[in-house]
Amino acid sequence: KEKESRLQLFDVLDESAFRKAPRLLHKYPGRVLFTASHCAMHCRYCFRRDFPYEKGRVEYEEELSYIQKDSSIQEVILSGGDPLSLSDPVLANLLSSLDRITHLKRLRFHTRFPIGIPERICSSFLDILTKSRLKIWFVVHINHLVELDQEVEEALNHILALKIPILTQT
């Protein structure tokens, strides 16, 4: 009850009505928002900064079951928290599970990690992306041009080298 009332207090987007599983929102046709369990950064514009995340949770049966049962869902948006706060083994398992859902076509990562922790875009993570049959997109959250240094550029270039489009959100 306390968790629910806390969520209602800080639910500025009125998302509670669209929650289909603990980490899954289905607000718009054809896509779902799959939220990560936590984030490594605190963004001042974050809508979910007070969200009652379940740290350490790496099983997503309810979320995957909901996606599997609704064939109108073609896109999964991995957001936050931040999906890159999950370990490579957890992400690999999640992407593998999503790959097996035949009606899915796209996977979108919304992340700030390439900006704040560019070394997260490492070879093991990139290898996970290459194994997916889904069309992957990245939406990178950038506050200001001064954040775009050489390390960030290299991280983004690693993603682009895989022919993965990158959009920005500020």
Regions found by a protein language model. Give the residues of each.
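Conserved AdoMet/S-adenosylmethionine-binding subsite of the radical SAM
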Residues: 61, 68-71, 75, 84-170
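Flexible, acidic/Gly-rich N-terminal and inter-domain linker regions that tether
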Residues: 1-26
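Short, charged beta->alpha transition segments
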Residues: 18-22, 32-34, 60-68
